[in-house]
């Protein structure tokens, strides 16, 4: 049995009937809101069977005069 499963299957196990939509799950994956985080395999997001949802742990604090390129990178979540 594989350790990685799709986000939708993981959400059914983690949240039950109240699982978020596929779009929201992808946002969670891009924001690394699971521990261990989801990874993109080809066109699909996959996640470890034992991962847990942790949400946003901390927001980076940027100075007001930060470089616009830095602000854009942080805003995109990359």
Curated annotation (Swiss-Prot):
GO terms (BP aspect): DNA recombination; provirus excision
Keywords, in A-Z order: DNA recombination, DNA-binding, Viral genome excision
Tell me which domain of life the UniProt entry assigns to the organism this sequence originates from: Viruses
Looking up InterPro entries in the UniProt record yields:
DNA-bd_dom_put_sf (IPR009061), Excisionase-like (IPR012884), Excisionase-like_sf (IPR038137)
Gene3D superfamilies, alphabetically? 1.10.1660.20
| GO MF term list | DNA binding
Q: Does the keyword DNA-binding apply?
A: yes
What is this protein's function?
Excisionase and integrase are necessary for the excision of prophage from the host genome by site-specific recombination at the att site.
Name of protein: Excisionase
Species this chain originates from: Enterobacteria phage P21 (Bacteriophage 21)
Q: What is the lineage of its organism?
A: Viruses, Duplodnaviria, Heunggongvirae, Uroviricota, Caudoviricetes
Originating gene: xis
């Amino acid at each position: 049995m594989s350790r990685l499963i799709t986000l939708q299957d993981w959400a059914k196990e983690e949240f039950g009937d109240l699982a978020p939509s596929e779009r929201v799950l992808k946002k969670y994956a891009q924001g690394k809101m699971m521990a261990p985080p989801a990874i993109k395999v080809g066109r699909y997001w996959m996640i470890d069977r034992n991962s847990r949802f942790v949400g946003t742990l901390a927001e980076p604090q940027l100075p007001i005069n930060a470089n616009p390129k830095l602000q854009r990178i942080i805003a995109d979540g990359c």
